[in-house]
Design a protein with these regions (language model features):
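Beta-lactam-recognizing serine transpeptidase/beta-lactamase-like catalytic domain environment
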Residues: 1-17, 23-188
Length: 188
C-alpha cells in the first residue's frame, strides 16, 4: 500500500569509500597490471598530470594538484601492495593507478562491473550513480571510493563477480522460496 517510497540501496547513489578498493585491486589483478612483489611509499601522494598523455606521475614536493594522504594521517612507510590493501591505503591505490593500472583500463573495468548504469532488475527502481573522471584527483579518488558515486545494489553486483570466480550475478527479486523436495512454499 505504499504509493511513494525510496529504496535506499538501489535509489541513493553515494561515495562508497574504502569498499571500492577491492574493485580497484580486482581490476589490476584481472587486467594483468597488479605489481606482485613491488612496494610503494605510503603516507602522502603528490603528483603531476600530463594533459597530453593523461599520465599521472608521483612526485616529491608540492604541486598544483592536491596531495592525497592515507586516512587519519597514517604513514605506513614502504610497504607491499598486498599490505597496502590490508591497511586500506589510499596512497597504495594512487600508486596503483599512477604506475600500473591505466585510467582507461580502470574506467573500462568500472563499466564492466556495472557501475554508472542502472542494474537490470525487475520491479526495483534504481539509480545509475555518477562517474566523475573530470580531473586527475577524481580518477585517483574514485579508486578509493570518493569523487564518483554508486549504489549499494551496484556494489553488491560487482562484488558478486569477485566472489564467484569472475562471473557477475545479476540481483533479482525473490517472490517465494520453495522446498525442492516437497515442492512446499517455505516463505512467500
Amino acid at each position: 500500500d505504499i504509493e511513494s517510497y525510496l529504496n535506499i540501496p538501489s535509489d541513493s547513489p553515494y561515495e562508497p569509500g574504502s569498499v571500492m578498493k577491492g574493485i580497484t585491486y580486482a581490476a589490476a589483478l584481472d587486467s594483468g597490471n597488479y605489481p606482485y612483489n613491488e612496494e610503494f611509499r605510503a603516507g602522502t601522494f603528490s603528483y603531476t598530470y600530463d594533459e597530453s598523455t593523461g599520465k599521472i606521475s608521483r612526485t616529491s614536493g608540492s604541486t598544483a594538484y592536491p596531495s592525497i594522504s592515507d586516512a587519519l594521517g597514517n604513514d605506513f612507510g614502504t610497504i607491499s601492495y598486498d599490505e597496502g590493501f590490508i591497511r586500506s591505503s589510499n596512497v597504495g591505490i594512487c600508486c596503483l593507478l599512477a604506475d600500473h593500472l591505466p585510467a582507461k583500463t580502470f574506467e573500462e573495468y568500472l563499466n564492466r562491473f556495472g557501475f554508472f548504469t542502472k542494474v537490470d532488475i525487475p520491479f526495483v527502481a534504481n539509480a545509475a550513480g555518477v562517474k566523475n573522471f573530470s580531473h586527475p584527483s577524481d580518477i585517483l579518488s574514485t579508486g578509493f571510493g570518493q569523487s564518483s558515486s554508486v549504489t549499494a545494489l551496484q556494489m553488491v553486483q560487482a562484488y558478486s563477480a569477485i566472489f564467484n570466480d569472475g562471473v557477475m550475478m545479476r540481483p533479482y527479486v525473490v517472490e517465494k522460496i520453495v522446498d525442492s523436495y516437497s515442492n512446499e512454499t517455505i516463505k512467500s
